[in-house]
């Protein structure tokens, strides 16, 4: 082994020193800060502490929301002996202790704000709230609530060909049959259902106005046997009074009622008779030659004389 080989292996070489850099401001010599342990590639960096954050995994852990669901019904109780303020203070204290154990870095107000924003954005927390809601609904309405929500096809009825309109010639008849079947299903269950308002079966005064009118022969028979007046199909009619003897007659000569034109004619005739009667009364007063107001004037003069006027 010669002298060159010894130099290549580093035997007898001088130890390395920090690189000295000439400072342009002071004019002195400064060491290079980027070199650590004589390694120019090493960088001096500080190790940061891990930042603890409030995440969905922390809220769904055993010390998170499951802890509240388990212990809140027992520890958060409202006492009638305490005031409303004391009861509310007792509830808030429970949640403050729970928040401090779960995430002690944040204050209670900041913890509530973080939980609110995280619950709106995280899908796992939304699913957890949905499961809690369904469990509560099952406790109130039974186990069938979840099965109905999970299998909505059980409640929906398949659409058949009879429910769809057809373009054939018999489409109207088929639609009418479907409507009739639907009406029968609806009316068939009215006896077992409870109505919000009681139905007055006896008060059928207005039902005669809306139901179909029987033929004229039956109307004539009813008018002859009773005092009730049926409503005809065409014109608006009124019962016959003593002042209006005219009316619409049936084929057998029975008077049913007067039409609208006959009513107007009867009113006009009555007005004419009244005017004629007044004219005749005035004519009788003129024939006697005595003014109707003269007797009253004479009585007034006699009364004034008695009083001394």
From Swiss-Prot:
It is found in: Nucleus. The keyword DNA damage applies. Residues 166-183 have a biased composition (Low complexity). InterPro entries: Csm3, TIPIN/Csm3/Swi3. Keywords: Cell cycle, DNA damage, DNA repair, DNA replication inhibitor, Meiosis, Nucleus. Component of the fork protection complex (FPC) consisting of TOF1 and CSM3. This is Chromosome segregation in meiosis protein 3. It comes from Candida glabrata (strain ATCC 2001 / BCRC 20586 / JCM 3761 / NBRC 0622 / NRRL Y-65 / CBS 138). The lineage of its organism: Eukaryota, Fungi, Dikarya, Ascomycota, Saccharomycotina.
């Amino acid at each position: 082994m010669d002298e060159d080989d010894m130099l290549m292996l580093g035997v007898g070489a001088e130890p390395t020193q920090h690189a000295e850099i000439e400072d342009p401001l002071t004019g002195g010599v400064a060491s290079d800060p980027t070199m650590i342990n004589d390694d120019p590639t090493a960088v001096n960096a500080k190790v940061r502490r891990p930042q603890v954050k409030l995440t969905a995994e922390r809220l769904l852990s055993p010390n998170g929301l499951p802890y509240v669901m388990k212990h809140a019904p027992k520890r958060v109780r409202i006492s009638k002996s305490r005031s409303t303020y004391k009861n509310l203070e007792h509830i808030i204290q429970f949640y403050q202790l729970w928040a401090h154990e779960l995430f002690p870095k944040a204050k209670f107000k900041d913890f509530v704000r973080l939980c609110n924003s995280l619950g709106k954005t995280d899908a796992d927390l939304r699913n957890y709230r949905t499961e809690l809601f369904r469990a509560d609904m099952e406790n109130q309405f039974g186990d069938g609530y979840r099965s109905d929500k999970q299998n909505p096809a059980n409640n929906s009825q398949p659409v058949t060909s009879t429910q769809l309109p057809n373009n054939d010639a018999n489409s109207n008849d088929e639609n009418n049959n479907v409507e009739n079947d639907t009406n029968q299903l609806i009316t068939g269950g009215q006896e077992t259902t409870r109505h919000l308002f009681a139905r007055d079966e006896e008060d059928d005064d207005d039902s005669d106005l809306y139901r179909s009118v029987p033929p004229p022969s039956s109307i004539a028979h009813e008018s002859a046997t009773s005092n009730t007046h049926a409503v005809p199909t065409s014109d608006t009619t009124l019962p016959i009074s003593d002042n209006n003897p005219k009316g619409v007659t049936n084929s057998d000569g029975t008077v049913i009622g007067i039409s609208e034109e006959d009513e107007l004619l009867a009113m006009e005739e009555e007005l004419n008779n009244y005017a004629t009667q007044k004219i005749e009364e005035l004519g009788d007063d003129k024939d006697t030659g005595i003014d109707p107001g003269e007797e009253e004037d004479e009585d007034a003069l006699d009364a004034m004389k008695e009083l001394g006027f």
